[in-house]
Amino acid sequence: MQKFFLVLSFFLIQTTIFSQSVDLEGKLKAQEEALKEKSKGEEKDTLSTDYYKIFYLDGRIDNVDTTLNIYKDYKFNFLREDSFDLISFANSAHTYNKLAYDFKDFSKPDIGARGKHFHYFEKEDIGYYNVPTPLTEIFAKSTYEQGQILDMLVSINLNPQYNFTIAHKGYKSLGKYINTRSRGNQFRFISNYESKNQLSSWKFHFVSQNIFNQENGGLDPDSIYFFEQASSYFVLDDFGNQIENEDGSFEMIEYDGYLDRSRLSPMLFAEGSLYSKRFFSDFKRVILKGKKDTFNTLALNYQFTHEYKKIQFNDPMNNKMFGEVLDFINDDQNVSDQNRFIEQENRLILSSNSNKLGKIQLSYSLTNWVNNFKIYENQDIGNSVFELNENQSNISFDWKKIFSKYTFELNFNKSSKDSFKSDFISLNIKGSPIKNLNFEIGSSIIEKSPNFNFKFYRSGFESYNWLNDNLHNEKISNINLKLSYKELLVLAADYN
């Protein structure tokens, strides 16, 4: 009996010890799992703004900037860029007086009316996004009087290869003066695709813009006098002479009503607008790619641009400040000029990127322009020209190479015909020999045709009708030097 009790006790003790060890191991494993889950929850998101990329047609790549600094304050305006060299008109979304002139303008001839294009989205201004998470950007600002500006952008990647962006800028401002109201809508749809093997990419955008401004031509002479003399005015007699008091002073009246700008009479009651739609497509295919070095590539691009613009000017009072109206415009009609412009371009680009030679790009483009004007009712056309249809082809060569701390750039373009040409050659050297101190020196020779409105224009005003067949091209030789310290100090000099 004692032996049986001892054996039974031995097995019971062993079973208890074994069960305790199993429970202890289970608790340890549970604690380890809990620690792992806790550590996962405490892991910080390592995603930074460097992953939010913006690509431009010229090859520039920017990161989305979410910092708050003094540079952002310089750009907190209607143009959303540093407007140091611009003097704005009396209301938002109007034109500007430009104090600095860029002599390195390599652009092709356009419709003209550059006063309407300060905040116009050109195809070079469109950025193509690639973001790991949905991105929203909102810019809002009040205007001078009874209005706001809202510019909103939403960018989403459906997958790592495809991104689409929708943006809209809307604004309205009454202004402080009579007949200076402005309003507009600028819609952008942007698409960016790149294949997984990075051999194919496609950039596309559609932009619709509607820019409207009332034009008052400035204040009339009486309004200028009353505004400058406020708030003390001389009292005149029936003959227009000043009334003299007994003490020898002239009688005056106090009235500050003309300090209210909304009561001052303007020179003009007219309206001007710019309406535009543009489709742009850029398809790229890498033909050759180095196995070891991704910089040794050879690629082919096809770019297509179709842009339509319509500029209108309406003067219901047929103001004489522009001269006499044409004979067929009677008292029941008003001047309502309309200019339509279509540009269509096809471009082929062969580009190479190698460590030894740098970036080389050779392109050929064919451009067609159609520029026509409105024909008024009862207008005798006769032999007058109301439409131009022009073609131009261009060959371009671009080279960029980085040597140590210095970057060399060479740009060349040659047009096939003299009319509406845009020939240029430019050499540029950039460098940063000292931290935060940058320099740029360059030279360029440009020969280009003026915009279409210098060569050809039709209007209801007699003095604004011309067709300049023998208009000379503009020739510019330029040497420029630029020194900058961060973005706080910029010194630039040009010799032409």
Protein language model features and the residues they cover:
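Bacterial Sec-dependent N-terminal signal peptides
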Residues: 1-25, 200
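Outer-membrane beta-barrel initiation region
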Residues: 46, 57-158, 243, 251, ...
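Outer-membrane beta-barrel translocator/receptor signature
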Residues: 130-178, 182-187, 200
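The feature marks either
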Residues: 39, 232-259, 278-282, 293-308, ...
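Sec-dependent signal peptide cleavage junction
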Residues: 17-76, 80, 234-249
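Exposed, low-structure sequence patches enriched in small/polar residues
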Residues: 131-133, 269, 273-317, 331-496
